Amino acid sequence: MGQKVHPRGFRLGLSADWQAKWFNEKNYKEWLLEDEEIRKFIKNRYYHAGISEIYVERPDAERINITVKTARPGIIIGRKGAEITSLREELERKFNRRVVINIEEIKTPELDAQLVAESIASRIEKRASYKVAMKRAIMNAMRKGAQGIKVMVAGRLGGAEIARREWYLRGRLPLQKLKAIIDYGTATAWTKYGTIGIKVWIYKGDADI
């Protein structure tokens, strides 16, 4: 039986980048837990901001550089930068280090796999048809220039007694091609019948490597 490889981990250093850019043998465990806490804190605080990825860089032991990729930068920045200043000060108090926050706007959220997965999850939680939500996401991605997209949902679909999985594929999805730029995202929809898992793969073309 074939084993699945994470699309991002398979391409690290080629067409994908690391979400954490630091190494410290002595404090590795502490810093790793801090990274996860930072990501969870920002995601929970700005869950309506369309946050896709949060990168953490540590130039030294006293500084943390955070880059947030979001579809709605205005929510995080706030009026005249008040919100981002408040966030920075709170993180500095929490972790006792100097924090620098950079915001990167996602120009085309329809081509961001994480945002697409979260959008489908949100529609399912609002009792929309999972088939309609999947097909709409695929149509929007292809219209915006995706070369291929696959969406898979698993769970008690439509309130069925037995859990199952369904998927739709449009275009090409060369998962074994190292230079293929494949974005991957996951999300969970919480329904009264239980959880429904969503996975999204988007093929955006090939990297020059």
From Swiss-Prot:
It comes from the Bacteria. Residues 38-107 form the KH type-2 domain. GO terms for cellular component: cytosolic small ribosomal subunit. Part of the 30S ribosomal subunit. Forms a tight complex with proteins S10 and S14. Binds the lower part of the 30S subunit head. Binds mRNA in the 70S ribosome, positioning it for translation. NCBIfam families: rpsC_bact (TIGR01009). This is Small ribosomal subunit protein uS3. The gene is rpsC.
